[in-house]
Amino acid sequence: MVYDGKSHQSVARHPELANRSFVISSFGKTYHVTGWKVGYVAAPEHLMHEFRKVHQFNVFTVNTPMQYGLAKYLECADHYLNLSDFYEQKRNFLRSGLANTKFKLLPSPGTYFQCVDYTQLGIPESQLSSADFCQWLTKDMRVAAIPVSAFYSEPVESGVIRFCFAKKEETLQSAIDRLQKI
């Protein structure tokens, strides 16, 4: 997923990198089926041979019916060729809804998350840690967010949280309506 007229540049496009690179992806994240737990790895044979040695001891079983379902779904190229446009529209919808708030919108050029800085909202809650702010946002405003600090190995307080816009438009509009009241 890449937006704003840009295109993804995989390391696999460059022969000197492709020979020593893995391409890893998750169907779950891309196609809204996270519970299915289906992904894939592609690499040159010499790397795949080594990868399989490790993988066989990390995965007990596969979800075969879902693999068949995904294979059928992928027969129509539009399902994956139009993904960037699909998510870009959702991103733009959320961004335009938050444009006149005091949330500082950070760039979101290729993801289904919109990161925002909440520290300039001018409310007492804007002084909370990002984890506490997200709890307040979820409990009191009924909008879920994740602090980006949750993904750091060392505690970092940046005042940045992320919203997922891979949602139905009605869900996004409801969140926008609530966030505009802050």
Model feature map: region roles:
Residues 1-182:
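PLP-dependent class I/II
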